[in-house]
Amino acid sequence: MRFTGIILILISMTLIDSFFEMKVEATGPQTTCQAAMCEAGCKGLGKSMESCQGDTCKCKA
């Protein structure tokens, strides 16, 4: 029964993660997104980079 509970928790975490997009925003005086920093931040979250525009870095869900 515990194993089934763990599986249900993992599945629900995966589904919730797929509905909410993660955003990584660099702090500091920079006003433009740097692709290398954005990609490194997304990799730190275990995701790949989706886009880097303006001052917003988006990671793929």
UniProtKB/Swiss-Prot annotation:
Its main location: secreted. One of its GO terms (molecular function) is toxin activity. GO terms for biological process: envenomation resulting in negative regulation of voltage-gated potassium channel activity in another organism. The lineage of its organism: Eukaryota, Metazoa, Ecdysozoa, Arthropoda, Chelicerata. Expressed by the venom gland. The record marks K60 as: Penetrates into Kv pores (more deeply into Kv1.3 than into Kv1.1). Reversible blocker of both Kv1.3/KCNA3 potassium channels (high affinity) and Shaker B (mammalian Kv1.1 analog) potassium channels (very low affinity). Residues 1-24 form the signal peptide. This is Potassium channel toxin alpha-KTx 18.1. Disulfide bonds join C33-C52, C38-C57, C42-C59. Keywords: Disulfide bond, Ion channel impairing toxin, Neurotoxin, Potassium channel impairing toxin, Secreted, Signal, Toxin, Voltage-gated potassium channel impairing toxin. Belongs to the short scorpion toxin superfamily. Potassium channel inhibitor family. Alpha-KTx 18 subfamily. GO terms for cellular component: extracellular region. It is found in: Secreted. Has the structural arrangement of an alpha-helix connected to a beta-sheet by disulfide bonds (CSalpha/beta).
